[in-house]
């Protein structure tokens, strides 16, 4: 969907990108992050060995909406500590 919308809207100088977040320390994910059993299973699958902080997701979004990404459209940015690498 991201790529389709990016192609359709690019002529209007509208950029469409997606953020693909990894496990992030939020209230929404607390049932996962506060479970020692789950964290014991999940952390080894993340090459960086930790979960993300919300501000790390915010930084990625700030990049995507900034002028530094003015020629970026149709991108799916993985911010997952290398989990999908």
Language-model segments: residues:
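Hydrophobic alpha-helix immediately C-terminal to the catalytic Tyr-X-X-X-Lys motif of short-chain
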Residues: 1-5, 9, 19, 64
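Short, glycine/acidic-enriched loop or turn micro-motifs at the edges of active sites
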Residues: 25, 81-83
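A short hydrophobic alpha-helix cap/turn motif
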Residues: 9-11, 24, 52, 65
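C-terminal helical subdomain
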Residues: 18, 40-68, 72, 81
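Short, small/polar-rich loop/turn modules that mediate ligand/substrate recognition or access, typified
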Residues: 10-15, 72-74
């Amino acid at each position: 969907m991201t790529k389709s919308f990016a192609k359709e809207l690019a002529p209007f100088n509208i950029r469409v990108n997606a953020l693909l977040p990894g496990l992030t320390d939020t209230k929404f994910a607390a049932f996962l992050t506060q479970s020692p059993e789950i964290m014991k299973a999940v952390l080894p699958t993340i090459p960086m060995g930790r979960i993300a902080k919300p501000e790390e997701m915010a930084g990625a979004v700030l990049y995507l909406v900034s002028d530094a990404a003015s020629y970026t459209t149709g991108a799916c940015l993985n911010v997952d500590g290398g989990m999908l690498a």
